[in-house]
């Protein structure tokens, strides 16, 4: 694996339990978790680099897409911040030249019990289904990777009902 794409969300970041912790407009709640998101992404990068990865592209994929602090990431990384209004959305920058995808901070789908931050793409969607099944962002973005022939290597995700997700 020489070239890795990392898509990073925040709602599945360790310790998050409230929407305020995901919102830049509430800095006394948000700042800690934005730093935690950055630490988790940095850890994924360090592990990939130690395993021989030479090119790491990170897509900050939460809300404003300005959550990860690039200054706290290893020098050998590149980060896409903000939104390009591209159909790949949270996967912007991914193409068939990548050897793999890693997801950090992902979460369960809208309508899944057990996670107070469950949603799919935005809180306006009551649910999103693919072939009749509730589809979390992880599934939708894995399908984008699959369509390009890029395998998913790792997902750091909060799953409220693993058996339902694994039955996909």
Predicted regions span which residues?
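Short beta-strand segments
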Residues: 7-8, 59-60, 101-106, 155-156
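N-terminal glycine-rich phosphate/adenylate-binding segment common to multiple enzyme folds
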Residues: 81-124
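Active-site glycine-rich loop that binds ribose-phosphate moieties when present
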Residues: 85, 122-148, 157
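N-terminal glycine-rich anion-binding loops that anchor highly charged ligand groups
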Residues: 5-22, 33, 37
């Amino acid at each position: 694996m020489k070239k890795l794409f990392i898509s990073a969300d925040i709602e599945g970041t360790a310790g998050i339990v409230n929407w305020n912790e995901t919102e830049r407009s509430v800095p006394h709640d948000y700042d800690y978790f934005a730093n935690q998101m950055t630490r988790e992404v940095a850890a994924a990068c360090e592990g990939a680099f130690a395993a021989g990865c030479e090119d790491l592209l990170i897509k900050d994929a939460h809300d404003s897409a300005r959550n990860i602090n690039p200054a706290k990431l290893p020098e050998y990384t590149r980060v896409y911040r903000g939104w390009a209004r591209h159909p790949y959305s949270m996967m912007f920058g991914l193409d068939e030249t990548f050897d793999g995808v890693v997801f950090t901070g992902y979460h369960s789908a809208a309508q899944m019990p057990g996670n107070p931050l469950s949603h799919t793409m935005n809180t306006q969607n009551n649910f999103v289904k693919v072939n009749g099944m509730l589809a979390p962002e992880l599934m939708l973005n894995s399908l984008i990777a699959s369509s390009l022939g890029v395998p998913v290597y790792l997902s750091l995700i909060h799953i409220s009902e693993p058996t339902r997700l694994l039955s996909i």
